[in-house]
C-alpha cells in the first residue's frame, strides 16, 4: 500500500502483479510490506510463483511486536512462512520511518525456527540481489 496522496490504492493490490510474475518467471519481484493489508493475497502469490518475494517492512502502530504478531501469526499463519515461504521473505524496516532494531527484535521473538530467521534476516536478500542461491529443502 502506498501512502502517497496521489496514488490510488486499487493499484497497490498484490494480485495486480500476477500477470507479470507469470509472464516473467526469471524476474524477481518484491511485493513490499508483505502486501499489507492484503497479506494473504501476497502469500498466495508467493506460494504460486517462486519469483515473488516480500519484505517485513510493514507499517506498525507503536508496537512492532504486537503488529508482527497480528500480521505474521494471524493474518498469515507463522507455519506458512516457516514451512513454505521461508525462502521468499526478507527483513525490511522502512528505516528511517521506523526503528529497525525494534522491528528485528520483534521478528526474532515470534518463534520462527533459527534457520528461517537466518533466511529472513539476510540470506534471502543476498539471493534476491543475485548472490548465492539458497533454495534448499
Predicted feature locations:
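Conserved, mostly hydrophobic/aromatic
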Residues: 33, 54, 94, 117, ...
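Detector for Asparagine
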Residues: 51, 63, 94-95, 124, ...
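Mid-to-C-terminal alpha-helical segments outside catalytic/metal-binding sites
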Residues: 85-88, 98-137
